[in-house]
């Protein structure tokens, strides 16, 4: 991962590994969503390992991961990975709710979600199509340096995940919403998926309606909508 990347922007990367590199330590400072195009990936927890197969979408949390990328019968291992910060995820979820009226919820909880720092599921047709189209975009050098295009693709990816039925992948992604923001953002995020008026939100934040609207736009770059 590029250590100098802007943590406020997603980074979309295509990896092609022609040579087998064995088990490697991967240290993540941001969350990762990826898709295995060819080959398979092993993720290790001590003596236990989990397989991410071709056509699977995977999530990897912040921290250290021991991974092994396996080529496919002499053909290079290939994957597409999107890195994102919790702050960016929170802004995207807020945009989906405020601009498109999405009521984003999750009721899925399981032992594997709680215990493991990754999850892998078979990609739905829409997610598979998303990653394959993204692969074609990555062939254009201009896309790789276009932060707006990356943000649009990131929003699309999060939409496809959170609009899907509740599962491990959706649960893991939604668990990444940052809880360390100041009180203003905590109040907003705690209530954006409920039927709360702008006036009520302003009162909860101890702001006048005018001050609330100004501060909301400063935090989220869009005005609040009723």
Language-model regions, residue ranges each:
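Aromatic- and histidine-enriched alpha-helix N-cap/loop-to-helix transition segments
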Residues: 28-31, 152, 179
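Conserved phosphate/pyrophosphate-binding and hydrolysis machinery centered on Walker-type P-loop NTPases
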Residues: 147-151, 174, 205
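N-terminal regulatory/effector-sensing and dimerization cores
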Residues: 6-106
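Amphipathic alpha-helical segments enriched in hydrophobic/aromatic residues interleaved with Lys/Arg
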Residues: 96-156, 160, 186
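Short, leucine-enriched amphipathic alpha-helices that occur as contiguous helical runs
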Residues: 177-185
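Short, Lys/Arg-enriched N-terminal segment that forms or immediately precedes the first helix
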Residues: 17, 165-172
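Basic/polar phosphate-binding segments, predominantly the helix-turn-helix DNA-binding elements
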Residues: 160-167, 187-191, 195-226
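Short, basic, alpha-helical segments at the C-terminal edge of helix-turn-helix-like DNA-binding modules
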Residues: 176-177, 226
């Amino acid at each position: 991962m590029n250590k100098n990347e802007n943590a406020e922007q997603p980074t979309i990367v295509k990896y092609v590994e022609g040579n087998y590199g064995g088990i490697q330590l991967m240290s993540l400072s941001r969350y990762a969503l990826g898709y295995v195009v060819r080959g398979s990936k092993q993720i290790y927890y001590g003596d236990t390992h989990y397989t991410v197969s071709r056509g699977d979408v995977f999530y990897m949390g912040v921290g250290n991961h021991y991974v092994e990328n396996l080529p496919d019968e002499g053909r290079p291992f290939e994957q597409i990975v999107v890195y994102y910060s919790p702050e960016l995820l929170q802004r995207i979820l807020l945009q989906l709710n405020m601009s498109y009226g999405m009521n984003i919820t999750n009721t899925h909880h399981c032992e594997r979600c709680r215990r493991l720092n990754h999850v892998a599921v078979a990609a739905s047709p829409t997610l598979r199509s998303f990653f394959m189209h993204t692969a074609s975009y990555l062939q254009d050098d201009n896309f790789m340096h276009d932060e707006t295009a990356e943000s649009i693709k990131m929003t699309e990816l999060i939409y496809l995940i959170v609009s899907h039925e509740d599962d491990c992948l959706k649960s893991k992604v939604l668990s990444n919403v940052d809880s360390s923001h100041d009180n203003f953002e905590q109040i907003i995020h705690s209530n954006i998926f409920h039927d709360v008026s702008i006036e009520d939100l302003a009162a909860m934040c101890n702001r006048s309606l005018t001050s609330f609207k100004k501060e909301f736009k400063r935090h989220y770059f869009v005005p609040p909508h009723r």
